[in-house]
Amino acid sequence: MAENTASHRRKPRSLNDRHYSILQDLSAPPRQPPSSSHGEDEETKKSMIKLAGRRRLCKALPKEDEADGYDDPDLVDFYSPVKGETSLDSAGIGNKFTSWDESKEANTELAGEPNFSIITDFCSPSPQLKQKEEMQGDGGRNEIMGILDDLTSKLGTMSIQKKKDSQSNDFDACGVKSQVDKFDFEDAKSSFSLLSDLSKSSPDVVTTYNAGVNSIKDKQGKSGFAIREEQTSKEFSREWEERISNVGKQNSYSGRHFDDNSEDNRQGYNLDRGKSQCKEVDQSMKTTRHIEVSEKIRTVGRSNAAKLRDLDEDDDDDDCLILSGKKAAEMKINKPARSYNAKRHGYDERSLEDEGSITLTGLNLSYTLPGKIATMLYPHQREGLNWLWSLHTQGKGGILGDDMGLGKTMQICSFLAGLFHSKLIKRALVVAPKTLLPHWMKELATVGLSQMTREYYGTSTKAREYDLHHILQGKGILLTTYDIVRNNTKALQGDDHYTDEDDEDGNKWDYMILDEGHLIKNPNTQRAKSLLEIPSSHRIIISGTPIQNNLKELWALFNFSCPGLLGDKNWFKQNYEHYILRGTDKNATDREQRIGSTVAKNLREHIQPFFLRRLKSEVFGDDGATSKLSKKDEIVVWLRLTACQRQLYEAFLNSEIVLSAFDGSPLAALTILKKICDHPLLLTKRAAEDVLEGMDSTLTQEEAGVAERLAMHIADNVDTDDFQTKNDSISCKLSFIMSLLENLIPEGHRVLIFSQTRKMLNLIQDSLTSNGYSFLRIDGTTKAPDRLKTVEEFQEGHVAPIFLLTSQVGGLGLTLTKADRVIVVDPAWNPSTDNQSVDRAYRIGQTKDVIVYRLMTSATVEEKIYRKQVYKGGLFKTATEHKEQIRYFSQQDLRELFSLPKGGFDVSPTQQQLYEEHYNQIKLDEKLESHVKFLETLGIAGVSHHSLLFSKTAPIQAIQKDEEEQIRRETALLLGRASASISQDTVINGADYAFKPKDVNLDKRINISPVDDKELSESVIKARLNRLTMLLQNKGTVSRLPDGGAKIQKQIAELTRELKDMKAAERINMPQVIDLEEDISRKMQKGLNL
């Protein structure tokens, strides 16, 4: 009767409990049944356990008495609906239960504990259980099959919520990403990306087939729960059927060991560590009897799990918390930049932890560049990574201004690869000229970022929108062009696509990179304004020529990359540009030179940490690696105009139409002069019409009318038939090119020929064809695929030894190291244009010595253009290099460009001046000296060595102590007056990589306010004008003058013009100078590409 009462009081056991009892009987010797009263007294209820922040609940059984063999909590139902949150009854908490930790100290044995737990990893191999020979009968199997039927019917009714994630082929049966040996930072299919299905769920919870909190261990080393999601109910049943069928056939359990009374099973739970990449996270468990489990999981393990709280705050709809990643538990809570879970992006660190990797740290951040990329970099590129990392830790941008051909694109691509590898950024925007985008794609593929890159420059609007949405919703690199940015600024701001709440600063783009960033040198253009409207945490400009015409361009670039560094535009003009321009002029006084040098030094020191520039001569000279790059010799060949060219040139300058054009449109007149110097056939009637058609978009109606009259004036004086029959002889440049090729081609040299206009290339092409030379050509009409194909053909070296290119197209981004001779046919107002052309051949990968020929007609407008190039080059070096520069030339007055040479066209004053300056530095090897002598036989006016420019340091004039002290006091006064006008950020890190002068003091602030001494002269002029005007109004006085007041009227006219010129000069900060270079270079690039 008592037994029946006890049976009535005992609750029915669940299916798993019954199954556990059967397996217990199969694997252990029979025991004496314990007294029923023991189990009756310890009867407990099931408890519902809620994981903090998760919707699913886990039903747990408390420990029962030893009669039933339950010594640990068993998870029975993972998918049951929520019924309420209750506390866990911790009866029997004193029993020992091993953790899944690898520590052997936790693997202890206590008498009376069960042989194993029913909590089983169904992705692990089937267990091999000990058995007794007497338990192999058919009766036992029939009972087991009955249990299986019950389990199948039970599981068929269970509600299993399954996320329908699209899984990659890289996942095995357990939902664990396989080891990836291939090194590639891909997007939705690679180890470097966040899987597309994961991006739709919580960002830090991996919802694969097999996921769960691996273990929870209390402070005394006691174990808690092990939670697992299974694939489907069918797979669940099939796994158990296979496991039970193996009962009696296996003697050991591979992959997991359970605590047992035997000495062979004391290893603790082991979760098949060879496959699974889910990290074990230890958490403490309170020992009080009634514990709120949701509060426990949220608070325990504070030393590790709490540090990842920021990564999981938005995971309110997921089932279980999975802390994955090799270093996830080691992450620090203080993170100035974003850091992501290691497994969140499907990224396997072990496949990338190789030798030669670069690791940089700073401000609790860690940057790692895998060795497979790091080993591809030159030493100077590794230094560039250090500089870029210093900017990153400061939250700043900068200008990478390395000399052309030093691999700036590779430096940036490698740095981005390390940032993505280190989980420090999610998105980067790269803006470049369209001709450079294939080169970017190639370099990004080299560092393994090809699958992460999306193109945003095609003609299909829908395709562009799709790629933009893909990047903004996930991660990766977006490639686009300046024109696309200008027309799609709002879309790139990301307001319509962007939903990431992880960004504390609200910036959609972590990095914005501008290749050929000097294209935004004019801050008033829509191009520059649209780029400034796109939010970005870091802005990097890549430009080998950050200063092309004037210092205002430098301010514009830093205003984009480091806003506020140089103040506003007016402040920069008053405190820097004004004094530097005065000091760099050849006619500057000693005092102006010294003040200009002081201000220039301050400017260099101020921008130094944010501006990195290395020259090829420095990079491959200082580190003993000169063998890696060959030698370059640049020579200027001064040519004499042919008789026909000289006649046209003189007639044009002396004509009345030119004088009228001077007052109306000097740009159009300069265009005609340049074309006369290149080739008279450019100015035939048909060519004049072509020029007008191409210039319609850049010239006003008035300017177009002037240009038409000028061009037709020249065309009417040209005998077209005579020109056609004497194509080579009427142009000194074309005649020289053909004579030079007769010497170069037989010797096996390969030649690049650059011109600014397609029309000039056509004339050169006609001469090459008539002389039987094979050649290749690309210009603005060549399509991008054909352009790349042509470049590859030339680099292979089997098609043609001559390559014709326009400066605007061929001067950007191309690598033509197969050539060792470069001819620049016509100079550009912008010196960087010619320099870009030269560096197509002289760059990393060149193994031959390179000779560059810059063709200039002596005593013409081209010579004055070259002088202007040298002047601008000195200005650039003054602002960026720590050396006192030689002052070769002064600012030119506009009238000098239209004046006839005093010494005739056969002598070049510039060539003579440069020879006097550098004659003692000219040291030519035997081969080059012989070649120069050959050039002199071709009837040239002379040769200048362009490579020697700025090779000397300007002498510093000695001054008296009294004068020096006075200048020092005045400078200190100026510093004090301007120091409060702008706030400067403290400079940290990166300075050693930008410049390395010994006399740099980063803490020094030199801010100079202008002293406008023109106010006095302007007031004097106005006073004289007033006095002369009053005198002229006195009719009695004027009547007594011999000339009737004509001289007074002339003086008034001169003073009025002088005052007008002074005010115009003040607006451009170039006193008494009219400078049209900036306007000319802009319009010529658009209008003269014929």
Swiss-Prot record:
Q: Which GO terms describe its molecular function?
A: ATP binding; DNA binding; helicase activity; hydrolase activity
Per the annotation, the residue ranges of the short sequence motif DEAH box are: 515-518
Gene3D superfamilies listed in its UniProt record = P-loop containing nucleotide triphosphate hydrolases (3.40.50.300), Tandem AAA-ATPase domain (3.40.50.10810)
Q: Which residues cross the membrane?
A: none
The short motif Nuclear localization signal is annotated over: 44-51
Q: Where is it mainly found?
A: nucleus
Q: Which residues form a coiled coil?
A: 1043-1069
* One cellular component term from this protein's GO annotations in UniProt: nucleus
- Functional note: DNA helicase that acts as an essential component of the spindle assembly checkpoint. Probable chromatin remodeling factor that regulate homologous recombination (HR) and non-homologous recombination (NHR).
Name it.
Protein CHROMATIN REMODELING 24
Phylogenetic placement of the source organism: Eukaryota, Viridiplantae, Streptophyta, Embryophyta, Tracheophyta
